[in-house]
Amino acid sequence: MAITLQESLRGLFYAPFYVALARGAYAAEGVEVDFESSPTPGQAAHGLLDGSVDVCWGGPMRVMETYQQVPGCDLVCFAEVVTRDPFFLVGRRQAADFRLTDLAGKRFATVSEVPTPWMCLQEDLRRAGVAPGSLE
């Protein structure tokens, strides 16, 4: 029997899973994995609820959102995969001495498919003394 594993989105921080799949590590341990991509990041949790997938990866924010949307939701998070804040900023120019405070008043775009990167950055900004609303 195979386990259907669904990724919610393609991310660099999930590289160990991609490597394990490509190198046959699951099969070497006797685990058959059918790997799928979710149509959208938000639909991964719903695949668990409707039984179309056995397990998916994603963050706790996705589970909390699903709890708000689906009465009686019983999803649980387990097996931490990514520790700390795995997201990164990409700038137009090199900034060797970059500080989060440099973002104040700057035009900024965040990923829109998932809420977690912006939520993490907002907290980082607040800790650096920058109001998230000061970014354009």
Where does each model-flagged region fall?
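Short, glycine-/small- and polar/acidic-enriched structural segments
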Residues: 1-136
